[in-house]
């Protein structure tokens, strides 16, 4: 297995037959969580095979083979589900610009670890996480002295992403870096 990619996190059980809620962390949930899909567990453990998948009130519910009651489902809470990076294919751009063109796209793992600098050349720190919030993606940038900046991951604020050079350039609006 090559490097695993986290595609979801198991949440709380739903009902009494072993269903669990899923915090989706992938571009194509319909493909990643299809019937029969085999998902790894970050940190090890037996793989989980999707026996049933459905959406309920805006949440993805899964049932895995061999997980047949609420107790077994509860034991899976907070497990991070992974796929093999070789199976992932290219990331999918579901955002288009005003001209209908897709933008540059990256896997989260391509961004974590990049140095973040301002357009003036000041070092902000390193990207430690990509947070997929309902209002949009945020880059968590760990500051050298501790703490972090949360930077909206939009072209206007992060005009340059260069994984080959190991850095991103941030053009912060006034006050963004003062908010902690």
Curated annotation (Swiss-Prot):
GO terms for molecular function: ribosome binding. It is found in: Cytoplasm. Its main location: cytoplasm. GO terms for biological process: ribosomal small subunit biogenesis; rRNA processing. It comes from the Bacteria. One of its GO terms (cellular component) is ribosome. Residues 103-176 form the PRC barrel domain. InterPro entries: PRC_barrel-like_sf, PRC_RimM, RimM, RimM_N, RimM_N_sf, Transl_B-barrel_sf. This is Ribosome maturation factor RimM. It comes from Frankia alni (strain DSM 45986 / CECT 9034 / ACN14a).
């Amino acid at each position: 297995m090559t490097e695993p990619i986290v595609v979801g996190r198991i949440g709380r059980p739903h009902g009494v037959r072993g269903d669990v809620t899923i915090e989706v962390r992938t571009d194509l949930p319909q493909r990643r969580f299809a019937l029969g899909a085999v998902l790894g567990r970050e940190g090890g453990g037996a793989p989980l095979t999707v026996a049933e998948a459905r959406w309920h009130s805006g949440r993805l519910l899964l049932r895995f083979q061999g997980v047949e009651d609420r107790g077994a489902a509860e034991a899976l809470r907070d497990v991070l589900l992974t796929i093999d990076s070789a199976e992932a294919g290219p990331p999918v751009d579901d955002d288009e610009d005003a001209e209908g063109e897709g933008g540059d796209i990256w896997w989260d793992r391509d961004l974590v670890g990049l140095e973040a600098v301002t357009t003036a050349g000041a070092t902000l720190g390193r990207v430690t996480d990509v947070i997929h919030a309902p209002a949009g993606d945020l880059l968590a940038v760990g500051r050298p002295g501790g703490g972090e900046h949360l930077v909206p991951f939009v072209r206007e604020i992060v005009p340059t992403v260069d994984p080959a050079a190991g850095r991103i350039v941030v053009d912060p609006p006034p006050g963004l870096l003062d908010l902690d």
